[in-house]
């Protein structure tokens, strides 16, 4: 779909619509909000290819890649900058609900938000760990909308079926925040080892399973969601582990690992092999995210750790 076309910029975005055989709600699924989170992109593409209208009640809108220019230019999110458009240097996930008279990224955000998200009943954003990230599989729902929207979003987050889910005060001007503020229940599925670039099947299938479960939850598909038997909720916020030395980072713990307080999780070494620093877990918890940097400076974020409620 063409959104902007002038002498300065042309913006296109792939949009797939599956109109079900029966009436029902409208669900919009977005991928590629951060364009190098490839597992979400691949999952969205496969769902458009494989989902049969005969099996659907309602309408499913699928955007495999919102930020097509960043996807084509392989613009990552990394330590110094969020993933940005090569057209105007802006991050799409920081300019919602957009501006029809703004820069190219703001025009794109305005179209996605007003013409697609606001005309839907529910929204799922498929994420996948960016090129610097190794993420545990989990779902995220906003905790800072009105009570009813928060409730429905949490129901969606649980219905994904993952072992872990998390409530979060999401950032203003992000897609999930602005959608939920407008009364559109909106969640994130986070599945992927972004640094591998070739998205692994387990993570792709986790996205697809989550969307399928949510469609069953809303009676858009027949059957009942398949839910992990022992779901756990992450606490809000992170315990961060940062480098205190300049050197080469050797990660020992990875996403999903269960940690004891004081456990060795990594080292920073010199080029002569000397150990400059040992990294230990500050909590009993779970590795939410490993930042897969090799060369690190003082202050670089290496781990986000979370605790489990209860």
Mark where each language-model region is:
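Structured catalytic-domain cores with a bias toward divalent-metal coordination
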Residues: 1-310
């Amino acid at each position: 779909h063409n959104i902007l076309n002038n002498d300065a910029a042309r913006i296109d975005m792939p949009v797939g619509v599956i109109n079900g055989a029966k009436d029902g709600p409208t669900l919009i699924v977005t991928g590629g909000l951060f364009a190098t989170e490839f597992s979400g992109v691949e999952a969205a593409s496969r769902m458009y290819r494989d989902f049969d209208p005969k099996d659907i009640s309602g309408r499913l809108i699928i955007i495999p890649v919102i930020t097509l220019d960043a996807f084509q230019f392989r613009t990552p999110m990394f330590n110094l900058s969020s993933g940005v458009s090569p057209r105007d240097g802006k991050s799409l996930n920081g300019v919602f609900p957009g501006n029809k008279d703004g820069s190219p990224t703001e025009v794109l955000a305005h179209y996605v938000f007003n013409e697609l998200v606001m005309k839907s009943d529910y929204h799922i954003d498929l994420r996948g760990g960016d090129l610097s990230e190794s993420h545990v599989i989990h779902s995220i729902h906003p905790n800072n909308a009105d009570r009813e929207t928060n409730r429905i979003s949490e129901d969606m987050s649980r219905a994904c079926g993952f072992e872990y889910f998390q409530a979060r005060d999401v950032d203003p001007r992000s897609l999930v925040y602005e959608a939920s503020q407008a009364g559109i229940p909106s969640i994130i599925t986070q599945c992927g080892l972004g640094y591998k670039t070739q998205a692994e099947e387990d993570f792709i299938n986790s996205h697809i399973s989550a969307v399928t479960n949510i469609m069953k939850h809303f009676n858009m598909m027949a059957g009942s969601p398949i839910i992990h038997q022992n779901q756990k909720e992450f606490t809000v916020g992170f315990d961060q582990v940062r480098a205190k030395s300049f050197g080469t980072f050797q990660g020992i713990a990875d996403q999903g690992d269960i940690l004891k307080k004081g456990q060795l999780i990594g080292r920073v070494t010199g080029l002569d092999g000397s150990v400059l620093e040992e990294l230990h877990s500050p909590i009993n918890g779970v590795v939410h995210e490993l930042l897969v940097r090799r060369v690190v400076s003082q202050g670089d974020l290496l781990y986000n750790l979370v605790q489990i409620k209860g």
